[in-house]
Amino acid sequence: MLSVAARSGPFAPVLSATSRGVAGALRPLVQAAVPATSEPPVLDLKRPFLSRESLSGQAVRRPLVASVGLNVPASVCYSHTDVKVPDFCDYRRPEVLDSTKSSRESSEARKSFSYMVTAVTTVGVAYAAKNAVTQFVSSMSASADVLAMAKIEVKLSDIPEGKNMAFKWRGKPLFVRHRTQKEIEQEAAVELSQLRDPQHDLDRVKKPEWVILIGVCTHLGCVPIANAGDFGGYYCPCHGSHYDASGRIRLGPAPLNLEVPTYEFTSDDMVVVG
């Protein structure tokens, strides 16, 4: 306050700074000036001895506040009576509420309880994480209707010799052809040098009399017509691709042979595709 009053300029005549001492443990803001003297201080023997009772009599009886203004003294509050001391009894265990009792007697029980809670929590979190991962992985797998269409069984006795039967498998047409002996000998005699996509007939079949193909043209994905074309196999009317009875491209814009799916003969009269 003294520095404020000194720098106030024209308001200095109306400003005043006062320092009041309040009993407490803190130091005052402004130190009182002590006159310089060479004489030793004289003890006042008549001053009463400051005991606990005399100090309590000098203690502050009411709350102190700090105020600053014009032409008023400034005071500082060194005591806060509205501050509550924190009490953590609600967070402490009953075994350690008594401060006069040693906590070593109950340390084993408290540690065992903490370990048990930690173990149960870890198991629960691991189980929940396992379920979450399982559901996430299963959501990326194929649905039940797709799995049902993943494989198809074809009864071969329903397909007469020299005929081709079409099925729907995984959203695509599936051709199952029962070839005659003449077609088998004709396709086996084709030289690989004459083929755009060289592949021997025996490499495309497991049984010479049965040809199983995916009926999708390798040009632009059209569906060829069976028992048609210049080579008596399959013909795509969209752009004029000709395939033989083994599904090999012989003429037209298609670059590759018809695809052969994975299949297995479970018996002489049954084949499983997929």
From Swiss-Prot:
Q: Does the keyword section mention Translocase?
A: yes
Q: Which InterPro entries match?
A: bc1_Rieske_TM_sf, Globular_prot_asu/bsu, Rieske_2Fe-2S, Rieske_2Fe-2S_sf, Rieske_Fe-S_prot, Rieske_Fe-S_prot_C, Rieske_TM, Ubiquinol_cyt_c_Rdtase_Fe-S-su
**What is the E.C. number?**
7.1.1.8
Compartment(s) where it occurs, according to its Swiss-Prot or TrEMBL record: Mitochondrion inner membrane
Cofactor note as given: Binds 1 [2Fe-2S] cluster per subunit. Fe-S cluster delivery to the Rieske protein is mediated by components of the iron sulfur (Fe-S) cluster assembly machinery that reside in the mitochondrial matrix (including HSC20 and LYRM7).
Keyword vocabulary terms for this entry: 2Fe-2S, Disulfide bond, Electron transport, Iron, Iron-sulfur, Membrane, Metal-binding, Mitochondrion, Mitochondrion inner membrane, Respiratory chain, Transit peptide, Translocase, Transmembrane, Transmembrane helix, Transport
Q: Supply the enzyme class, top level.
A: translocase
User: Does this entry carry the keyword Ligase?
Assistant: no
Entry GO CC? mitochondrial inner membrane
Q: Where is the Rieske domain?
A: 187-272
Write down the membrane topology: Single-pass membrane protein
Recorded GO terms, molecular function?
2 iron, 2 sulfur cluster binding; metal ion binding; ubiquinol-cytochrome-c reductase activity
What is the required cofactor set for this protein?
Answer: [2Fe-2S] cluster
Q: Its domain of life?
A: Eukaryota
Coarse class of the protein's main subcellular location: mitochondrion
| Residue sites binding [2Fe-2S] cluster per the record | 217, 219, 236, 239, 241
Q: Record's family?
A: Belongs to the Rieske iron-sulfur protein family.
Any further remark recorded for this protein: The Rieske protein is a high potential 2Fe-2S protein.
Q: What is this protein called?
A: Cytochrome b-c1 complex subunit Rieske, mitochondrial
Q: Which gene encodes it?
A: UQCRFS1
